[in-house]
Swiss-Prot record:
Cofactor needs: K(+)
Binding site for GTP: 225-230, 244-250, 269-272, 334-337
Swiss-Prot/TrEMBL GO biological process terms: tRNA methylation; tRNA wobble uridine modification
GO MF annotations in UniProt: GTP binding; GTPase activity; metal ion binding
Chain sites annotated for binding (6S)-5-formyl-5,6,7,8-tetrahydrofolate: R22, E79, K119, K453
Annotated residues for binding of Mg(2+): S229, T250
CC terms in the record's Gene Ontology section: cytosol
Protein name: tRNA modification GTPase MnmE
UniProt-annotated location(s): Cytoplasm
E.C. number: 3.6.-.-
Keywords from the UniProt entry: Cytoplasm, GTP-binding, Hydrolase, Magnesium, Metal-binding, Nucleotide-binding, Potassium, tRNA processing
Gene name as annotated: mnmE
InterPro entries with a match to the protein in the record: G_TrmE, GTP-bd, GTP-bd_TrmE_N, GTPase_MnmE, MnmE_dom2, MnmE_helical, P-loop_NTPase, Small_GTP-bd
Cofactor note: Binds 1 potassium ion per subunit.
Length: 453
């Protein structure tokens, strides 16, 4: 239970028609009486002057008072909606801070108090920040679905299923003399398999939700004059990179951020890779490799007029040897307008091969679809939810625990070990909603929020 009262501007800094100052805590009513000269009717909008310490009006606007627990934070809350000039907002906040017991809110503290007072769970609290930071319409819709509890509901359903299964398994352990062998009657295995399937579905949705939030990093790499910068320009839809016939034109990393059907895509053009004595070009090549090694996918650009090869190892074995195994590689044969080769995508020795013309944009639509498919993107995200990297990690750990539980059940018929793995899976899932989270984790999450949220 908090004893202090916090205040902050809830709207973004800067000039605007309306600015909102939010107060939350036990002294909210006292603030209202001092600043407004009266106590507004609860949950009714009243148009009132906001007064300074001498009783002179600082501003005038709408005052809204909410009583605990019927507020965003679950505490007494006062919201003052005035004119959105930065000077006016600052004067109003400073006036409120003169009142005893008031202090400035930390970043995310209003949402943190809402979480601590069970007004929303941790995934919903994170969805507030994701909604504010959404970079596309689909990302905003998915964040709203998370805020409304869609993601949390799926997690809670999994936790409840695990709880019921744990009860059944532990009952079998506690009553070993019963005539029925509970662990071998098929119910435990059937329920466990159903939970694992349900978890896999949620993991798939969460991966797409994380994709909408974070996007994927695609690095265009290859030898000089393969058409890397031309592809960057074609994907970006503008002349972002300088394109010439001179090898080594691109000497530094160029970045473009675009959206493909709502999916954030971070495209990085790099210097052509080759042996060179040019010090500046060498630095560019070192930076290129640094980006390649952190990519989600590499587009390996090949000048189709110089070779008919499609196997990257045949084209450049040293490049393939240095590329980290975890990074996906797509071969992009450029200048198909000159070679006249078939544009149909193909699979060659485990690598996708696309034929395009970065100059005329032949085959570019197929490459765009490939990039979306690489991250498991699906066109229909209307019912999706937003997810973060920590959510994916928690889901992955829960899945690993259930795989161990499955082995303990099928191979060893070890009820105690099955129950323990189910408990660990529950803990991992509960981290997502905050039912089982360390103070350090909560601090990191809420400190990343805006002040006033």
């Amino acid at each position: 239970m908090t004893t202090d009262t916090i205040v902050a501007q809830a709207t973004a800094p800067g000039r605007g028609g309306v600015g909102i100052v939010r107060v939350s805590g036990p002294a909210a009513e006292q603030v209202a009486e001092i600043v407004l000269g009266k106590l507004p009717r609860v949950r009714y909008a009243e148009y009132l002057p906001f007064r300074d310490e001498q009783g002179q009006p600082l501003d005038q606007g709408i005052a809204l008072l909410f009583k605990a627990p019927n507020s965003f934070t679950g505490e007494d809350v006062l919201e003052l909606q005035g004119h959105g000039g930065p000077v006016i907002m600052d004067m109003l906040v400073r006036r409120i801070l003169q009142i005893k017991g008031l202090r400035p809110a930390r970043p995310g503290e209003f949402s943190e108090r809402a979480f601590m007072n069970d007004k929303l769970d941790l995934a919903q609290a994170e969805a507030i920040a994701d909604l504010i930071e959404a970079s596309s319409e689909q990302a905003a819709r998915s964040a709203m679905h998370s805020l409304q509890g869609q993601f949390s509901g799926k997690i809670q359903q999994l936790v409840e299923s695990l709880t019921r299964l744990r009860i059944y398994v532990e009952a079998a352990i506690d009553f070993p003399d019963e005539e029925i062998d509970f662990l071998s009657d098929g119910k435990v295995a059937g329920d466990l398999y159903a939970i694992m399937a349900e978890l896999d579905d949620v993991r798939g949705e969460a991966k797409q939700g994380a994709l909408l939030r974070e996007g994927m990093k695609v690095v265009i790499a290859g030898r000089p004059n393969a058409g890397k910068s031309s592809l960057l320009n074609a994907l970006a839809g503008r002349e972002s990179a300088i394109v010439t016939e001179i090898a080594g034109t691109t000497r530094d990393v160029l970045r473009e951020h675009i959206h493909l059907d709502g999916m954030p895509l971070h495209i990085i053009d790099t210097a052509g890779l080759r042996d060179t004595q040019d010090k500046v070009e060498q630095i560019g090549i070192e930076r290129a490799w640094a980006e390649i090694e952190q990519a989600d996918r590499v587009l390996f650009m090949v000048d189709g007029t110089t070779t008919a090869a499609v196997d990257p190892r045949e084209i450049w074995p040293e490049f393939v040897d240095r590329l980290p195994k975890k990074i996906g590689l797509t071969v992009v044969r450029n200048k198909a307008d000159l070679t006249g080769e078939d544009l149909a995508p193909s699979q060659e020795l485990g690598h996708a091969v696309y034929r395009i013309s970065a100059k005329t944009e032949l085959g570019l639509s197929a490459l765009r679809e490939h990039l979306k498919a690489c991250m498991g993107f699906q066109g229909n995200t209307e019912g999706g939810f937003m997810a973060r990297r920590r959510h994916l990690d928690a889901l992955e750990r829960a899945a690993e625990r259930l795989l161990v539980a499955k082995e303990q059940l099928e191979v060893f018929v070890a009820g105690e070990l099955v129950a323990e793995e189910l408990r660990l899976a529950q803990e991992s899932l509960s981290e997502i909603t905050g039912e089982f989270s360390s103070d350090d984790l909560l601090g990191r999450i809420f400190s990343s929020f805006c002040i006033g949220k």
